[in-house]
A protein has these predicted regions:
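Hydrophobic/aromatic-rich core segments of domains that either
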Residues: 67, 71-138
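Generic structural "secondary-structure junction" signal
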Residues: 28-38, 46, 51-56, 125-127, ...
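Short secondary-structure transition/capping segments
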Residues: 46, 93-96, 254
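N-terminal accessory/pre-domain segments preceding catalytic cores
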Residues: 1-15, 19, 75-76, 143-264
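Short loop/turn segments at secondary-structure transitions that flank enzyme active sites
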Residues: 37, 116, 199
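Secondary-structure boundary elements
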Residues: 1-57
């Protein structure tokens, strides 16, 4: 598996640092939830993830990304702690379900499952790390739920909180089921595809809205025509999808767009 994984992220079979591995992963394997909208179960066993994300060159969301990455790191000799956290993106104080999977290696956060805001390399607990023009940091705090947690920030923006309590693969089956099937889950309501592009550009496609955040802070937004969706997913995001899959996703997003209330 490890040879195929390294080839998938564009690395040779030599020794690589955690920083090299993490950047290669987040720039090679897109964050995405498309299988939810194609009516497929999100499986978290490593064999299924190797088939999907390596052999079929698809992406995945946090449980898929970090489960695959943890397996690769362990195959390379690293000791990995699997953690669980709460997303804080849009409101840092509201209680949130614990639905984000994160990873630790030797006191370093090595998460590859947070989409376009994902750190480009390891971040030390209680410290910060700068990659290109972006700085991530972790700090101890007490969450609204009363937990002693680590807060992860991109600059000053809160991303998520997590604890260092070790979790096992079976612990993610229930939050994965909620995230991929429950009508209140953000992932069942819209398609989300994100990645770090070349040049440290954050690229996100939510429904048919494309957002590009450039290193200098400029933000570009574009409305995507459903007929152009396939070229965008295959080209910009590197996802191998057949014509039927693209058509189904385009129809879903066109329906979502037409059902959305008009802006005045």
């Amino acid at each position: 598996m490890i040879e195929r994984y390294l080839a998938r992220v564009g690395l040779d079979g030599g020794d690589h640092s955690l920083a090299e591995l993490q950047r290669a992963h987040v720039q090679s394997i897109s964050y995405e939830n498309l299988d939810i909208h194609l009516g497929r179960e999100i499986r978290l066993d490593v064999d299924s993830l190797v088939d999907k994300m390596i052999d079929r060159r698809r992406g995945g969301y946090c449980y898929e990304q970090n489960t695959l990455y943890a397996a690769a790191l362990e195959a390379l000799g690293f000791t990995v702690t699997r953690c669980l956290g709460r997303v804080r993106l849009s409101d840092a104080v509201s209680p949130r379900p614990a639905t984000h999977m994160a990873l630790l290696v030797d006191g370093l956060l090595v998460d590859v499952g947070f989409g376009a805001a994902n750190p480009l390399g390891p971040v030390p607990l209680g410290g910060e790390a700068t990659y290109g023009p972006y700085t991530w940091r972790t700090e101890r705090t007490v969450s609204p739920e009363g937990e002693q947690v680590w807060m992860v920030r991109l600059f000053d923006m809160p991303l998520y909180t997590f604890t260092e309590t070790p979790h096992h693969p079976i612990d993610y089956l229930t939050p994965n089921h909620f995230s991929s099937t429950h009508p209140l889950s953000l992932f069942t309501q819209m398609t989300i595809v994100q990645r770090w592009d070349d040049g440290d550009v954050q690229v996100g496609l939510v429904g048919l809205g494309l957002t590009e955040r450039l290193p200098d802070g400029e933000v570009k937004t574009t409305s995507v025509d459903p007929g152009d969706l396939g070229d965008l997913l295959r080209g910009r995001f590197g996802l191998e999808l057949d014509d039927d899959e693209v058509d189904r996703l385009a129809r879903f997003n066109a329906q979502q767009q037409s059902a959305a209330p008009a802006r005045s």
